[in-house]
From Swiss-Prot:
Main location class: cytoplasm
GO cellular component, one term: cytoplasm
Residues the record lists as binding Zn(2+): 117, 119, 202
A Pfam family recorded for this sequence: Aldolase_II
A molecular-function term among this protein's GO annotations: zinc ion binding
Protein name: Methylthioribulose-1-phosphate dehydratase
Domain of life the protein comes from: Eukaryota
Residues the record marks as active site: 146
Organism: Aspergillus oryzae (strain ATCC 42149 / RIB 40)
Keyword Transmembrane: no
Organismal lineage: Eukaryota, Fungi, Dikarya, Ascomycota, Pezizomycotina
UniProt-listed PANTHER family: METHYLTHIORIBULOSE-1-PHOSPHATE DEHYDRATASE (PTHR10640:SF7)
Protein's job: Catalyzes the dehydration of methylthioribulose-1-phosphate (MTRu-1-P) into 2,3-diketo-5-methylthiopentyl-1-phosphate (DK-MTP-1-P).
Length: 241
């Protein structure tokens, strides 16, 4: 079993005056996401990879109240399963690791530098609309909207254009967060250029090369989801023929 090093040995990993340090960025991002309505009721999560360390927001902490000392740190790479084998090198004694951990690891194993999980209402709504209109295997698709240009075509392939069709895969929710890992990885394998996966009736996972890219992609997607819901109300198709 991997040795679990408790927090009082490695507090230095989350102590920094640098505002760009992951232990400072994660609480700041969580406060923003809370204010935007993305992570209410302690839901959602954020994780950042810096070199061979992964910094992860804990489970059960109100996002607007999160502090650097609440952050978990993992050695990377690390096993996803079983949880007891994960290489924690900084583990707050009074908190639980995020249930999103194996899903974040799936993104990091594919080269991401940051992964964001939100419970955005707009993300949830578009998964329901797609299910109603296209069935359980449908994708979220939208075209001819300026904000699509904020989403990458794929790693190293530049950004989507105005006339391109954005396609985001949707997976089914499960009773426990960690049980989403297999279907998330399958969606990643089948859609290697995607930077996001929607979870029906739940939310979305978005990842990027770094914090700025993951954040701006998440913002662009949420804008597009809200716009899509409003377009649907007006009878305007998401994909222009």
């Amino acid at each position: 079993m991997a040795k679990q090093v408790e927090n009082n040995n490695n507090d230095h990993l989350v102590q920094s005056t640098d505002p760009e340090h992951p232990s400072n960025l994660i609480p700041e991002l969580c406060r923003k996401f809370y204010n935007w309505g993305w992570v209410t009721g302690t839901g959602g999560g954020t994780s950042i990879r810096r070199d061979d360390h992964i910094f992860i927001a804990p489970s059960g902490v109100q996002k607007e109240l999160m502090k650097p000392e609440n952050i978990f740190v993992l050695q990377f790479p690390t096993p996803k399963y079983p949880p007891s084998e994960r290489k924690y090198i900084r583990k707050p004694l009074d908190l639980k690791p995020s249930a999103c951990t194996p899903l974040f690891l799936a993104a990091f194993e594919r080269g991401a530098g940051c992964c964001i999980h939100t419970h955005s209402q707009w993300a949830v709504l578009v998964t329901l609309l797609v299910e109603r209109e296209k069935g359980p295997g449908g994708y979220f698709e939208i075209s001819n909207i300026e904000q699509i240009k904020g989403i990458p075509r794929g790693k190293g392939k530049g950004m989507l254009g105005f006339f391109d069709t954005l396609r985001i895969p949707i997976i089914e929710n499960t009773a426990f967060e960690e049980d989403l890992t297999g279907s998330l990885e399958k969606a990643m394998e089948e859609n290697p250029d995607t930077c996001a996966v929607l979870v029906r009736r739940h939310g979305i996972y978005v990842w990027g090369d770094n914090v700025a890219k993951a954040k701006t992609q998440c913002e662009s997607l949420d804008y597009l989801f809200q716009l899509a819901v409003e377009m649907h109300k007006l009878g305007i198709p998401w994909v222009k023929e």
